[in-house]
Swiss-Prot record:
PANTHER family: 3-DEOXY-D-MANNO-OCTULOSONIC-ACID TRANSFERASE/TRNA GUANINE-N 7 - -METHYLTRANSFERASE, PENTACOTRIPEPTIDE-REPEAT REGION OF PRORP DOMAIN-CONTAINING PROTEIN. Catalyzes the formation of N(7)-methylguanine at position 46 (m7G46) in tRNA. This is tRNA (guanine-N(7)-)-methyltransferase. GO terms for cellular component: tRNA methyltransferase complex. It comes from the Bacteria. Belongs to the class I-like SAM-binding methyltransferase superfamily. TrmB family. The keyword Mitochondrion does not apply. Keywords: Methyltransferase, S-adenosyl-L-methionine, Transferase, tRNA processing. S-adenosyl-L-methionine binds at residues 79, 104, 131, 153. Pfam families: Methyltransf_4. Residues 1-10 have a biased composition (Basic and acidic residues). The keyword Transport does not apply. The active site is at 153.
Amino acid sequence: MTPDDPRDASDASLADATADSASRGHGSFFGRRKGHKLRAHQAELIADLLPQLSFDLAAPPPADLRALFEPGVDQVKLEIGFGGGEHLVAEAEAHPATGFIGCEPYVNGMAKILAQIEARGIRNIRLFAGDAAELLAWAPKASLARIDLIHPDPWPKRRHWKRRFVQDATVTAMARALRDDGEFRFVCDIDDYSAWTLSHLTRSPDFAWTAERARDWQNPFAGYTMTRYGRKAEREGRRAAYLHFQRNAA
């Protein structure tokens, strides 16, 4: 690999996007940032396209997050940890008047969604390669219509539970960023983490669990696009829980 190899630039671009977050010690909710070696075009997308779709948390947020997008966007939704981007891309294509922010620190996942954005000409996705906790703190109050957390890292060992994204502090942060009647959707095939999330959200005065019967959490949300991780869980005999919460009026 030569000094001019775009794969060097891709690492530098992602490092720039995440260094500020890491320096403040909030990088504990996610694990590795990079897996297999990027192909040349993937590296070019990280170096060239990602900066066009990213935003800088060092700058003050816009008063309205819709300003991050082209005119015509009427609401903004956030997906935390989008993995390969299957769900986020499907949502963006199905709802062109909604702006979507995708948060993913894993460089290979970022490369995958950038390739889809380029190939499909998607214009209503913005990307953030750092820590979602930092993003929630930066976002204006009541600026999001929905937050999705789909198949997050379950951190199954008890000593690692503090690294799970769902914590009392992040529940409070999500409540601040969501508008009244905004939604939080959680999908997980690990029963322990689903129970953990249900416990944290139902004890919060800011959220109400909307399920009225078992099928409300046993079946996917209407229009839901299964992710690669979801299909893998099904093949291995694990059934996901689909938890839907609504932000109570402040």
